[in-house]
Amino acid sequence: MTISPPEREAKVRVTVDTDPVPTSFEKWGKPGHFSRSLARGPKTTTWIWNLHADAHDFDSHTSDLEDVSRKIFSAHFGHLAIIFVWLSGAYFHGAKFSNYEAWLADPTGIKPSAQVVWPVLGQGILNGDMGGGFHGIQITSGLFQLWRASGITNEYQLYCTAIGGLVMAALMMFAGWFHYHKKAPKLEWFQNVESMMNHHLAGLLGLGCLSWAGHQIHVSLPINKLLDSGVAPEDIPLPHEFLFNKSLMAELYPSFAKGLTPFFTLNWGEYADFLTFKGGLNPVTGGLWLSDTAHHHLALAVLFIVAGHMYRTNWGIGHSMKEILEAHKDPLIIGGEGHKGLYEALTTSWHAQLAINLAMLGSLSIIVAHHMYAMPPYPYIATDYPTQLSLFTHHMWIGGFLIVGAGAHGAIFMVRDYDPAKNVNNVLDRVIRHRDAIISHLNWVCIFLGFHSFGLYVHNDTLRALGRPQDMFSDTGIQLQPIFAQWVQNLHSLAPGNTAPNALASVSPIFGGDVLAVGGKVAMMPMTLGTADFMVHHIHAFTIHVTALILLKGVLYARNSRLIPDKSELGFRFPCDGPGRGGTCQVSGWDHVFLGLFWMYNSLSIVIFHFSWKMQSDVWGTVDPDGTVSHITYGNFAQSAVTINGWLRDFLWAQASNVITSYGSELSAYGLLFLGAHFIWAFSLMFLFSGRGYWQELIESIVWAHNKLKVAPAIQPRALSITQGRAVGVAHYLLGGIVTTWAFFLARIIAVG
């Protein structure tokens, strides 16, 4: 950290332009108003594709960085408005169409539902029996559990929140318009990273955590404590009563009677009755202790608020981003000019900034997926198996898409924003200069992992086919135990009293300990890892490395390669390097993203299959009064998942029976979706396995027929370009694949869970 005399630093100011862009519905009503060529209107059918491709590509509208920044800033408000409308809709469904109050009274006996189908064509069959006389569609979003944890005790509160969401959406819409058309920030405001870091860390994250901790302490904790002890929701005081009536709170948490005295006299331990460090899960609800999570958010709030005072603005004290980056160099690891030049790259390229943020947020989403099942954060979510499976799958896929997006915007940065003159011998330049070594080594790793991990399965299938189980890799044959993972599990289970001396229990029974049963179902129990997990883990390693190889190659070779030295002149997406140069197709940055999407999907399919089967086999199930656990698939993972045939027969085929035989039941919609999504997936292959010329010839013969009948269109039909065809192909491939998996998973887990 440095302290500098204030006069040396440029002052942080909020500077805006007033009325920079007129509000003109007439202009916006004209399709393609943002592009001179598109505004002329369609000559061929390609126009509609270009309209969609370029509508949000602000770089193509203008080269003025300030205007691009304002458009992105304004679009963020629009995005937030959509999110608020979407959330409001979810809360409204909870208020109007759900059995939330019935579920709250009996969360282990009643299934959550927030949608009732109108029987127009006999779809009434889809309204399954949720218990308590309610018929509807079972939901798996985890919202009921979240609402319970928030302290929502009736549907009227959900109505109020839904209306609040719409008010916020309107506010966001107004803000988006206001900050583009009325008072638009100047470029210097967007580029002031120290002020941005301070406000985002202290404001968004710090005060965000603090307000959530405050809500948890003053509203969630007392309401959940009463619910856990069996008080009926309608008998619990309303949130404002807990806020303003100290004696009500003091009955539940005695330290409330002392007010703020312990805080100001530094006797913070007095508050340990509601800010706990118990560890483990609440045996009543199977979720994390809410007093632990309140403590956690309070601690995070303190950290982030402190972090929000780290960067130097108008007071001459604190860190400077540029100085930090330019000081990052050492001869051993970083080398050369280190991070010099990155400050300029990140303050002039939104693509560079976005690539980093997408990579981080995508990784975070994947980490969240894994934490949410191992340490269930909300009451009764652990025993709601369909919700656990859905949330894991959802966060994995979101993370995968965001990481591929990071590769996309990294490549766009290289093509559109990278300036070689400003990156001489810094880390970026040095990575690009030894890209051949990076990519060839990564390729070797992929080949090694692929052949060896797949080879283990081929070996096992062969020996099982030949009737030699003792020579297979399995827990009962040749063992390949995941010793490092088992060591980490053991480390976690031994932490209380050792490395975590104040914790009463380890973070979750999943690492070791006793079975935690809630309502006769397993909420969480130790997960034994064995040879089958070791093998599929290396398949994960293989597919993740291939995805990384494709995306990284796309970024590092986005500007040029030995094959096409002038790639940056061709742009981010181009089909081939012109006629007369064979073997130059599928080399653009865009094509790497296209291929990366398939491997991301491939990779995550195996992850969610592994999770689904492992949990059904070794964790989820029923618990008898004598403590006997019966798992859903009776622990068949360890022996079946070591062969390819086992995966096909005992997972895909055996568990697809629920969706395939769903006709005539409330799960029949999943049966229809399963078939329909297979169709969409197959439809994608028509775009992926065909040539443009074939379609152009076909179109021309159809146009000839139209001319004969004198009904020729004014807009000339054109076959999709190579890139357009690929975009349509990958979109339908992923949509079909994801919906197929969704239908397969939900029909299965709702039937058995």
From Swiss-Prot:
Transmembrane segments: 72-95, 158-181, 197-221, 293-311, 350-373, 389-415, 437-459, 534-552, 592-613, 667-689, 727-747
Catalytic activity: reduced [plastocyanin] + hnu + oxidized [2Fe-2S]-[ferredoxin] = oxidized [plastocyanin] + reduced [2Fe-2S]-[ferredoxin]
Residues holding chlorophyll a': H678
Cross-referenced InterPro entries: PSI_PsaA, PSI_PsaA/B, PSI_PsaA/B_CS, PSI_PsaA/B_sf
E.C. number(s) listed in UniProt: 1.97.1.12
Cytoplasm as UniProt keyword: no
Binding positions (chlorophyll a): M686, Y694
One GO CC term, this protein: plasma membrane-derived thylakoid membrane
Known role: PsaA and PsaB bind P700, the primary electron donor of photosystem I (PSI), as well as the electron acceptors A0, A1 and FX. PSI is a plastocyanin/cytochrome c6-ferredoxin oxidoreductase, converting photonic excitation into a charge separation, which transfers an electron from the donor P700 chlorophyll pair to the spectroscopically characterized acceptors A0, A1, FX, FA and FB in turn. Oxidized P700 is reduced on the lumenal side of the thylakoid membrane by plastocyanin or cytochrome c6.
UniProt name for this protein: Photosystem I P700 chlorophyll a apoprotein A1
Gene source species: Trichodesmium erythraeum (strain IMS101)
Underlying gene: psaA
